[in-house]
Amino acid sequence: VKWSDKERAVIISIFAGLDYEDIGPKALSRCLIVYPWTQRYFGSFGNLSTPAAIMGNPKIAAHGIKVLHGLDRGVKNMDNIKDAYTELSILHSETLHVDPDNFKLLADCLTIVVAAKMGCAFTPDTQLAFQKFLAVVVSALGKQYC
């Protein structure tokens, strides 16, 4: 993947400005509420029976934060994202058996949450760079499924 200097700067700036403890739980909660079939991977996380239960679930919040910290790996390894996610790809494909389509769903939910937080600063150019980055990460996470 080729990254322009502008794309790199935008991605680094977005992640530097995110409150992971706010954005991570909101993005994962949104995914589990909007796409309820994704809840099947979180059976050990307790009550997921209602949107309020999901949004108030501390295990969901903690995992959402963990996901955002996992994206730091991509930000720090933009020239080698596929290799940076090999371990996580193996974990999600071989151990957790996560449907790789769910990575895209979560990326879409993250985009919505980040856009809502950034407001007018989430310009089309910003969205372009952000979604390009997430698409590369999603592809890297799914590479072990092939």
Swiss-Prot record:
One GO CC term on file: haptoglobin-hemoglobin complex
Keyword Transferase found: no
Keyword Metal-binding: yes
Domain Globin: 2-146
Highest rank taxon of the organism: Eukaryota
S-S bridge residues: none
GO MF term list: haptoglobin binding; heme binding; metal ion binding; organic acid binding; oxygen binding; oxygen carrier activity; peroxidase activity
Tissue spec: Red blood cells.
Pfam families: Globin (PF00042)
SUPFAM superfamilies: Globin-like
Record's keyword terms, sorted: Heme, Iron, Metal-binding, Oxygen transport, Transport
Binding partners and assembly: Hb1 is a heterotetramer of two alpha-1 chains and two beta-1 chains; Hb2 is a heterotetramer of two alpha-2 chains and two beta-1 chains.
Function as written in the Swiss-Prot or TrEMBL entry: Involved in oxygen transport from gills to the various peripheral tissues.
Family: Belongs to the globin family.
Name of the molecule in the record: Hemoglobin subunit beta-1
Lineage of origin: Eukaryota, Metazoa, Chordata, Craniata, Vertebrata
